[in-house]
């Protein structure tokens, strides 16, 4: 699917929802956004905020032959370019920024989604068999199964046999959920309903892994399960969300090739509102073809 097709899908879905087509959003200060570049410099300041736009736009090459080329290169990518060297070693500011980004990525893996936040969104919260974050990181197999209490809650509080069941899970990035939720879930649910689909009760799974959607789909009898889950963070990019969609999942028979994945959903990648429109179109095609993953035809 090329960019033109994606834009057409977004326009079609947003028009059916009675909303204006979203305009390009100014990039956030995340690493995925294109920075406004500072001029090449020969000095370093340890007082500079390493998370600021100025620090991310810093050019550390001393006495460049073509400063304009470095500025354009730095503006065109979020990669670690134009950082310069001090002999064979990285410059102090470049190393500090690397360490700061690495710390930020570790923090978002270890953080918890606040229970107050889940309640504020009006979401039912259930858990996998995991009881804490340390166990979540060391026992991924337990994150693929719902706890007995969660199974009872789904059976008693959720709509059974929906066309589409939407699930939100923290995964490996708390920031991905809290930063993108408002811009992806409301338009996604509205788009699915506008398409005439029977949408199940959305809920939040704490400590969930991707494969947990198979058990959810089997319990609720959902035709399509859509899981919005936090991606493993990269250096400086902790807000990236993924969508894993699967048709008629079964714990015993569904394999990874049966899933369709849309990744890199954040303001510096695929905008959440645009992703919502693409997911609506994907769900419709899954129901039409009765397939997902590699079994779908283009």
Swiss-Prot record:
Cellular location(s): Bacterial microcompartment
Positions that bind adenosylcob(III)alamin: 210, 231, 261
Cofactors (names): adenosylcob(III)alamin
Catalytic activity: ethanolamine = acetaldehyde + NH4(+)
Alphabetically ordered keywords of this record: Bacterial microcompartment, Cobalamin, Cobalt, Lyase
Purpose of the protein: Catalyzes the deamination of various vicinal amino-alcohols to oxo compounds. Allows this organism to utilize ethanolamine as the sole source of nitrogen and carbon in the presence of external vitamin B12.
Protein name, UniProt field: Ethanolamine ammonia-lyase small subunit
Organism of this sequence: Salmonella paratyphi B (strain ATCC BAA-1250 / SPB7)
Gene this protein is translated from: eutC
């Amino acid at each position: 699917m090329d960019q033109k097709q994606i834009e057409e899908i977004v326009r079609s879905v947003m028009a059916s929802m009675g909303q204006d087509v979203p305009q390009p959003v100014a990039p956030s200060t995340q690493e995925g956004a294109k920075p406004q570049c500072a001029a090449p410099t020969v000095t370093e300041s340890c007082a500079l905020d390493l998370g600021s736009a100025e620090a991310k736009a810093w050019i550390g090459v001393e006495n460049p032959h073509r400063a304009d080329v470095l500025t354009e290169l730095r503006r065109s990518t979020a990669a670690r370019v134009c950082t310069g060297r001090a002999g064979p070693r990285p410059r102090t500011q470049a190393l500090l920024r690397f360490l700061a980004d690495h710390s930020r990525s570790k923090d978002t893996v270890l953080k918890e989604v606040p229970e107050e936040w889940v309640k504020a969104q009006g979401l039912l919260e259930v858990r996998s068999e995991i009881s804490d974050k340390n166990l979540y990181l060391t026992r991924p197999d337990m994150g693929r199964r719902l706890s007995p209490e969660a199974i009872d809650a789904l059976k008693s509080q959720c709509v059974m046999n929906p066309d589409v069941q939407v699930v939100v899970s923290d995964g490996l990035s708390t920031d991905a959920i809290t930063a993108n939720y408002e811009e992806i879930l409301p338009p996604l649910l509205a788009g699915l309903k506008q398409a005439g689909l029977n949408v199940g009760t959305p809920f939040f799974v704490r400590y969930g892994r991707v494969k947990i959607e198979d058990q959810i789909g089997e319990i609720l009898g959902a035709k399509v399960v859509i899981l919005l889950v936090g991606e493993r963070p990269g250096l400086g990019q902790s807000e990236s969300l993924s969508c894993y969609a699967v048709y008629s999942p079964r714990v015993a028979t569904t394999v990874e090739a049966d899933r369709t994945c849309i990744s890199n959903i954040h303001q510096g990648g695929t905008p959440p509102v645009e992703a919502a429109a693409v997911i609506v179109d994907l769900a419709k095609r899954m129901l039409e073809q009765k397939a997902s993953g590699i079994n779908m035809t283009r």
